[in-house]
Amino acid sequence: MKVTRKATPASRAAAFTALPPASQLATLAAWLEFAEEVYGQARLALGQISDNAHDEALYLFLRTLDWSLESGPEVLEHPLTPSQRIALRQVLHARAVTRTPAAYLTREAWLGGLRFYVDERVIIPRSYFVELIPRLADLLPEGTKVKRAADVCTGSGCLAILLAEHFPSAKVDGLDLSPEALAVAAINVKTLKAGKRVTLHRSDVFDALPPPAKPSEAYDLIISNPPYEPSAHVDKQDPEFAAEPRLAHDGGPDGLVIVRKLLRQARERLAPHGVVAVEIGGLRKAVNREFAALAPAWLETEDGSNCVFVVRAEKLRAWAV
């Protein structure tokens, strides 16, 4: 979760209303320069699409203009029509004054090279699993073919679909407690033609899915990017993050309520060689302290945050809870 200094509605509006004459905002480059000033003055929270104002504003403007995200630098100086300038003004107003997240304005988010539909019913997709999923097979015995996998707290379905993309022989279960989130996930499963490999379930962790009746039904992989923010932190979120469903953020008093349940239930559902991988934000010390008996291993990420831990099935089965 990103946290910025608070700006009042009046200060946000003031930052936006200082709009230069249209003649000074005749190109996308000029609008980008203005947008960066607005982002800074309004103290907008970042981290849902990009961690910097320039990249988020560029994405938002290209989408608003219906220009390709692969556009070259030449588009920056392309003259804008009056209607295009109006459209950019409207979308910047929505972003800066109402603090609407960019992904909710464009109704999309990109992850792992795939476009996912999103709206206010789901958390905006962002996860270190996008870089870690290709490495999960290395955690299994050599030659193991992933046949069964699960994504717990699937939200928009993005990680379940990415699992299916990377492990084409796998049947993937996507589980979520929210029927609203599952409705969005169903859109993405259909749009990305993943219906034969991804099955969605309404479930509080694994409550709706009993332990496997036979070994072939056990999971090789279980992943989860669960709600892990302590409740008190959720109460203080910036408006952009507060616009997302609270259910997707709130991990209980210490952030670990869902994680505890997941680990307890995973031990009955993993194959003997299986692993569970969980993204946990800034709770690494808390995880190491509470689950020391499980010997959690932390996966390295490109930015060094290393906030995803892995536990093996044999450790879970020997765990005294």
Report residues per predicted region:
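A general structural signal for well-ordered alpha-helical segments in protein cores
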Residues: 32, 57, 88-89, 156, ...
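Residue-level signal for inorganic ion chemistry
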Residues: 60, 99, 129, 159, ...
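S-adenosylmethionine
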Residues: 134, 169-171, 175-321
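N-terminal auxiliary segments of SAM/dcSAM-dependent transferases
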Residues: 5-111
